[in-house]
Swiss-Prot record:
Core subunit of the mitochondrial membrane respiratory chain NADH dehydrogenase (Complex I) that is believed to belong to the minimal assembly required for catalysis. Complex I functions in the transfer of electrons from NADH to the respiratory chain. The immediate electron acceptor for the enzyme is believed to be ubiquinone. It is a multi-pass membrane protein. It is found in: Mitochondrion inner membrane. GO terms for biological process: ATP synthesis coupled electron transport; electron transport coupled proton transport. The keyword 4Fe-4S does not apply. One of its GO terms (cellular component) is mitochondrial inner membrane. The gene is MT-ND5. Its main location: mitochondrion. This is NADH-ubiquinone oxidoreductase chain 5. It catalyses: a ubiquinone + NADH + 5 H(+)(in) = a ubiquinol + NAD(+) + 4 H(+)(out). One of its GO terms (molecular function) is NADH dehydrogenase (ubiquinone) activity. Its EC number is 7.1.1.2. It comes from the Eukaryota. It comes from Tetraodon nigroviridis (Spotted green pufferfish).
Length: 612
């Protein structure tokens, strides 16, 4: 057993070396070959994935619970910071999943970005991102986790704004940074609280020394951090906007890896939450609200990437619900299964978008199963996995989550919202399949559409296998940490499937109605609510600046200029002097009556003075 930590640490060091080596080669003054990314980087990713399987098999074979490696880094009199690596179920399974998904996406990017003059830099950014993600996943202290957290944040900014000549891409990148910065405040606050109250950032030590303390404040800060990074309700608008980045970026960062960092943080710190009902209820209600709101928004979107982005946000809400149920292992299982089919949905979308001359509107697609049968089939598999079709990857995690939710004694409001969102998932997933794959083509005839490129087929094929088998493989090899409910009424057992089927039937009915309709769609508020994203961007991004500008204008021009510089100064002096001036000027009008009255008044006054 003593060799296990050595093998695991060595494997991680080899993975880091394999990923850092291509970045170091770019530092040489001589320019890289155009195929550097395709040949060298893809090869390194493949090797890194194969190396990451070694600790996974070793871990599963030995039945270990966690292996921790500690190296001293910085010591002060009162505070120690170590390089501490934690190999447990979470890090040891997520690392191969992330590498496998990234390897597929990178190969796809070599085709998708082939005309980009800076493709090598793009690959370098993806490498740096993955290194930051692995640091975050394997960290056993808050400081290391923070380094990985900020690393994925800055790479997200650079990759969303990749096409920096486009105003929308720049705006989306800045939006992502600003929303994430709000979340980062939560993480920094919780770290500061831990440093001052617990005098440690080591996660194990924090668990031990905080047993009898009220942790509500730092836990709310951690939930704020997760809300920012994982696009929960309130800080969610950046995720759909991030679709301005290239499709491989959306597939990697904004579906399978970076956006789950917030949920992963809560999974890592879940022992702190176990006995804190405030934090758990907050997670449960926030997750339920997110999953329903974003699923509602996805119902009426027409941009294929936006629909997949909202579905990502909806699934992140479901993971947050699971953490609120105090089932972090189920949330992690959903992270792993979700990574495969969501990345595949994005790659299929990217392939179709490219085939149709960069057309993203699903109303202008249709009949793609005739032209791109493989991509359309995989899009359908991914959509079915997303809805939780039995025995595909999504079923194993989604069904378990909804069973846990149904049999819990917690908030019935959250339960009903989540079930409704599950039904909506089926509706928008089938809507995508119906509009993109089925029916007749609704686009102009372009140059011949060809999907027979290995760089397109192979990545989607690998992710399709993952979408079919990942759930079974992971559930078969991980023992549940909490005892699942062994018996439940058939109604509760079948609730998830029932609402999904209801959603599918609704979607079919709606799709057939929309293809036959003659009248134009009436302007209904619920439709606008969904289509305009709940009026959230309009209120937050438009109304707030507008109110600020109006207030600024009122204060600057009307209050300061009009009141202080005009009314208090010149106008006040004028208003005091005017009556006096008018009185005096009336006397000097040359009237003999006035002069006689003045003469007599003066005479009377002077006589009075003399007599007294």
């Amino acid at each position: 057993m003593h060799s296990t930590p050595l093998i695991m640490t060595s494997s991680l060091v080899i993975i880091f070396t394999l990923l850092i080596y291509p970045i170091l080669t770019t530092l040489s003054p001589s320019p890289q070959n155009p195929d550097w990314g395709l040949k060298q980087v893809k090869q390194q990713y493949k090797l890194a994935f194969l190396v990451s399987l070694l600790p996974l098999f070793l871990f599963l074979n030995e039945g270990a619970e966690a292996v921790i490696t500690n190296l001293s880094w910085m010591n002060t009199h009162t505070f120690d910071i170590n390089i501490s690596l934690k190999f447990d179920h979470y890090s040891i399974i997520f690392t191969p999943v992330a590498l496998y998904v990234t390897w597929s996406i990178l190969e796809f990017a070599s085709w998708y970005m082939h005309a980009d003059p800076f493709m090598n830099r793009f690959f370098k950014y993806l490498l740096t991102f993955l290194i930051a993600m692995i640091i975050l996943v394997t960290a056993n202290n808050m400081f290391q986790l923070f380094i990985g957290w900020e690393g994925v944040g800055i790479m997200s900014f650079l990759l969303i704004g990749w096409w920096y000549a486009r105003a929308d891409a720049n705006t989306a990148a800045l939006q992502a940074v600003l929303y994430n910065r709000v979340g980062d405040i939560g993480l920094v606050f919780s770290m500061a609280w831990m440093a001052t109250h617990l005098n440690s950032w080591e996660i194990q030590q924090i668990f031990f020394s905080s047993k009898d303390m009220d942790l509500t404040l730092p836990l709310i800060a951690l939930i704020l951090a997760a809300t920012g990074k994982s696009a929960q309700f309130g800080l969610h608008p950046w995720l759909p906007s991030a679709m301005e980045g290239p499709t491989p970026v959306s597939a990697l960062l904004h579906s399978s890896t970076m956006v789950v960092a917030g949920i992963f943080l809560l999974i890592r710190t879940s022992p702190l939450m176990e006995n804190n009902p405030t934090a758990l209820t907050l997670c449960l209600c926030l997750g339920a609200l997110t999953t329903l709101f974003t699923a509602t928004c996805a119902l009426t979107q027409n941009d294929i990437k936006k629909i997949v982005a909202f579905s990502t946000s909806s699934q992140l809400g479901l993971m947050m619900v699971t953490i609120g149920l105090n089932q972090p292992q189920l949330a992690f299982l959903h992270i792993c299964t979700h990574a495969f089919f969501k990345a595949m949905l994005f790659l299929c979308s990217g392939s179709i978008i490219h085939s149709l001359n960069d057309e993203q509107d699903i109303r202008k697609m249709g009949g793609m199963h005739h032209l791109t049968p493989f991509t359309s089939s995989c899009l359908t598999i991914g959509s079915l996995a997303l809805t939780g079709t039995p025995f595909l990857a999504g079923f194993f995690s989604k069904d378990a989550i909804i069973e846990a939710l149904n049999t819990s004694y917690l908030n019935a409001w959250a339960l009903s919202l989540t079930l409704l969102a599950t039904s909506f998932t089926a509706i928008y997933s089938l809507r995508v399949v119906f509009f993109v794959s089925m029916g007749h083509p609704r686009f102009n005839t372009f140059s011949p559409i060809n999907e027979n490129n290995p760089a397109v087929i192979n990545p989607i094929k690998r992710l399709a296998w993952g979408s079919i088998l990942a759930g079974l493989l992971i559930t078969a090899n991980i023992l549940p940490m909490k005892t699942p409910v062994m018996s439940m009424p058939p109604l509760l057992k079948l609730a998830a499937l029932a609402v999904t089927l209801l959603g599918l039937l609704t979607a079919l009915e709606l799709a057939s109605l929309t293809t036959k309709q003659i009248k134009t769609t009436p302007h209904l508020t619920p439709h606008h609510f969904s289509n305009m994203l709940g009026f959230f961007p309009s209120i937050i991004h438009r109304l707030s600046p507008k109110i600020n500008l109006i207030l600024g204008q009122t204060i600057a021009t009307q209050i300061i200029d009009l009141t202080w510089l005009e009314k208090v100064g010149p106008k006040t002096i004028s208003s005091i002097n005017t009556p006096l001036i008018s009185t005096i000027s009336n006397i000097q009008q040359g009237s003999i009556k006035t002069y006689l009255v003045l003469f007599l008044t003066t005479l009377a006054l002077s006589t009075l003075v003399l007599l007294t």
